[in-house]
Design a protein with these regions (language model features):
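Active-site histidine-anchored catalytic micro-motif
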Residues: 169
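Glycine-rich anion/phosphate-binding loop at the beta-strand->alpha-helix junction
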Residues: 184, 189-194
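Short, high-confidence coil segments that cap the C-terminus of an alpha-helix
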Residues: 96, 182-183
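Short loop-beta-helix segment that forms the pyridoxal 5′-phosphate
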Residues: 155-162
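Conserved "HGTGT" condensation-loop signature of ketosynthase/thiolase-family condensing enzymes
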Residues: 1-155, 194, 202-223, 229-231, ...
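Alpha-helix C-terminal capping segments
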Residues: 147-151, 174-181
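Short conserved active-site loop signatures built around small residues
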Residues: 166
Length: 241
C-alpha cells in the first residue's frame, strides 16, 4: 500500500469557520443548531446554517458561471485555516496537472434551480435567463469551481451517493495517488441547505422540532445542516521531496 500523508485539513459549518470553532464547540458542548429561518421555509425545526454565505462573493472571473450557495460555502471553507495557501503551494511544487480534485456532494447547487423555478415564465415555463445549470445545479460544479479557483488541471471527479459521497471521494483519491497519476489531492465534501432536503425530510416525518439529540433515548428526529470539509493528501515520497 502506498503511504499517504494528510498534509492539511479544514472545515466550516454552523459551528464556525475553520477547525478552532469545532474544537471549542466539542469541548464546551456548544451546538450551532438554530430555529429554521432559511429562505422562505416555514417549518418547525432546527437547522445548521452557516452564517454570512449570502454576502460571500466569488472572484470576478468565476462569479458569472459558478455563483451559488454551494460554491460560496466551498470557497469559505477553502480559505479557512490557511488551507488554500497549502493547495497553491502544492500546485507550484508539483505542477497543476499533478494535483487532483475529488469531492463529494448530494444536492450541489440545487437551491439555485429551486429559486429559479419560482421565477419561471408563467406562460412558457422558461427559467430565468441568468440561471446557470453548469455552475450551480450540476453536481460537478463544485469540483469545476475548485479547479478554476486554484488553476488546477489534474484529474477531477465528484461522487454523489448521499452520505457515502465523501468517503468514496477519499477512496478515489487514494487510488490515483497509489497509481502515481498525481502527487497531491484536494479531497472533501460540500453540501449546502436547499428546499428539497428540508421539505423532503420533513415530509417523511424525520425532522425534529428541537435541536437533534442523536444519543438521547427520547430523541425525536434529525436536524438538517450544511457544511464543507477538505483535506490535502500527498504521496509520502512527494511530500518528503
Amino acid at each position: 500500500m502506498t503511504p499517504i500523508r494528510l498534509s492539511a485539513m479544514t472545515a466550516t459549518s454552523c459551528l464556525g469557520r475553520g477547525m478552532a470553532p469545532f474544537r471549542e464547540a466539542l469541548q464546551s458542548g456548544r451546538s450551532g443548531l438554530m430555529p429554521c429561518a432559511f429562505e422562505t421555509v416555514k417549518l418547525d425545526t432546527f437547522v445548521g446554517e452557516v452564517e454570512g454565505l449570502d454576502a460571500v462573493e466569488l472572484p470576478d472571473n468565476l462569479r458569472s458561471i459558478f455563483d451559488c450557495r454551494n460554491n460560496r460555502l466551498a470557497m469559505t471553507a477553502l480559505e479557512a485555516d490557511g488551507f488554500a495557501d497549502q493547495v497553491r503551494q502544492r500546485a507550484k511544487q508539483y505542477g497543476p496537472a499533478r494535483v487532483g480534485v475529488f469531492l463529494g456532494t448530494s444536492t450541489a447547487g440545487i437551491l439555485e434551480t429551486e429559486l429559479a423555478y419560482r421565477e419561471r415564465d408563467a406562460v412558457t415555463g422558461t427559467l430565468p435567463a441568468d440561471f446557470r445549470y453548469r455552475g450551480a445545479h450540476n453536481a460537478f460544479s463544485v469540483a469545476d469551481f475548485a479547479r478554476e479557483y486554484f488553476g488546477l488541471t489534474g484529474p477531477a471527479m465528484v461522487v454523489s451517493t448521499a452520505c457515502s459521497s465523501s468517503a468514496k471521494a477519499f477512496a478515489a483519491a487514494a487510488r490515483q495517488l497509489a497509481m502515481g497519476q498525481i502527487d497531491a489531492a484536494l479531497v472533501g465534501g460540500v453540501d449546502s441547505l436547499c428546499l428539497t432536503t428540508l421539505y423532503g425530510f420533513n415530509s417523511l416525518g424525520l425532522t425534529s422540532p428541537q435541536a437533534c439529540r442523536p444519543f438521547d433515548p427520547s430523541r425525536d428526529g434529525i436536524s438538517i445542516g450544511e457544511a464543507a470539509a477538505f483535506a490535502l493528501l500527498e504521496r509520502v515520497d512527494g511530500a518528503e521531496a
